Amino acid sequence: MGSTSSLYAAIDLGSNSFHMLVVREVAGSIQTLTRIKRKVRLAAGLNSENALSNEAMERGWQCLRLFAERLQDIPPSQIRVVATATLRLAVNAGDFIAKAQEILGCPVQVISGEEEARLIYQGVAHTTGGADQRLVVDIGGASTELVTGTGAQTTSLFSLSMGCVTWLERYFADRNLAQENFDAAEKAAREVLRPVADELRYHGWKVCVGASGTVQALQEIMMAQGMDERITLEKLQQLKQRAIHCGRLEELEIDGLTLERALVFPSGLAILIAIFTELNIQCMTLAGGALREGLVYGMLHLTVEQDIRSRTLRNIQRRFMIDIDQAQRVAKVAANFFDQVKNEWHLEAISRDLLISACQLHEIGLSVDFKQAPQHAAYLVRNLDLPGFTPAQKKLLATLLLNQTNPVDLSSLHQQNAVPPRVAEQLCRLLRLAIIFASRRRDDLVPEMTLQANHELLTLTLPQGWLTQHPLGKEIIAQESQWQSYVHWPLEVH
């Protein structure tokens, strides 16, 4: 195949799972084409002399035969295969890698723990929104990476010898989910963390991001149970008590926890509790990408943008031919409304960002059809890949777009968990009003307005005589007041 291919592949031979990511480069960003993950549990095949068993190696090779079929379509220069903790440790890693290279037809690189940490950080920096100064945590099968950084630059990198597979074999070997086993696992993890904790705290962070299967599992549990998606020590302790209550690993049942993730969940949970405790982490969210994304973006030599969300919104506006001027116009009106009521409603900066994002995409449904455009918009946003936005934030955006006009579906605003239900209602009200007053699609036709909030009552003051001079506008606003009143949102217009 010619080297003009836009396909790239990244393969990560992890201690618990092997992963393959195949992407296509599209206008400076990546479009995911294939994700394959297989639980190989390589680390479980290490004996006391750190030799890999033949069975574990065979499981790995079998998985790579599946991957090899997909790699035939991609130029070798656009494939990167890396091996991590278990193959750093195994005394017979050379035997495994020689055959792996033969199967895949390309080199396999065993990377150092620091290089693994750097790549994980790059993957997060390219795909995850939020504050610029971050702490990234990745709990693997046999190692845990902790990285601090600002923007694209790392400030400290650590790869520690503990992982969910090795801790499972060491502290939950009897498969008992007893308090003593958790205590021993947490104590050992804290001892591993202690030598690096001061340096991590010295560099500091504004946001903490988790980039591993353990954190993914926690996110799935919390979404399934209707909680908000922020991981806190309190929630981790509750899940630990739930696990202890189940008694044994084979009887572990928690809403939202898949069978595939259950085996290494308690050991991963113990490590995460130790990290939260030792580093005094307040809350953590899930990263948009990690090691494989870091490999791909490294091959593409793409720079890390300061604002991932803005890049995502720009790409989608281009792809769906959204009228960018109109999106900006609505966003400007919405931002003005938000700034006038934020103190009375105690709204946070992230809510403003999410409202502006909804404005940028509010006409995406028109790319399908004018009829049911809000439903089309909600469907598209729910199902598009939106780097920089968490799953809960995507759901909120979809819900706001569903309710941008026509009667309000209050239950949908209450089913999202990115923000409290009351905040979702408030953002929805501001979006609807902004769309109405920017509907003439000209900056000079947007009236000067003041918006005041008094508890749930919104009072909108228009220029004198505006309602008389704009009979259609008056009718639309009267209809909007009626729709808002149906869901007990009082709106007065003067």
From Swiss-Prot:
InterPro entries: ATPase_NBD, GppA/Ppx_hydrolase, Guo-5TP_3DP_PyrP, Ppx_GppA_C, Ppx_GppA_N, PyroPPase_GppA_Ppx. Signal peptide: none annotated. Coiled coil: none annotated. It comes from the Bacteria. Transmembrane segments: none annotated. Gene3D superfamilies: 3.30.420.40, Exopolyphosphatase. Domain 2, Hypothetical protein af1432. Keywords: Hydrolase. GO terms for biological process: guanosine pentaphosphate catabolic process; guanosine tetraphosphate biosynthetic process; nucleobase-containing small molecule interconversion. Pathway: Purine metabolism; ppGpp biosynthesis; ppGpp from GTP: step 2/2. The keyword Hydrolase applies. GO terms for molecular function: guanosine-5'-triphosphate,3'-diphosphate diphosphatase activity. It holds the Pfam family Ppx-GppA. It catalyses: guanosine 3'-diphosphate 5'-triphosphate + H2O = guanosine 3',5'-bis(diphosphate) + phosphate + H(+). Its EC number is 3.6.1.40. Catalyzes the conversion of pppGpp to ppGpp. Guanosine pentaphosphate (pppGpp) is a cytoplasmic signaling molecule which together with ppGpp controls the 'stringent response', an adaptive process that allows bacteria to respond to amino acid starvation, resulting in the coordinated regulation of numerous cellular activities. Belongs to the GppA/Ppx family. GppA subfamily. This is Guanosine-5'-triphosphate,3'-diphosphate pyrophosphatase. It comes from Escherichia coli O17:K52:H18 (strain UMN026 / ExPEC). The gene is gppA.
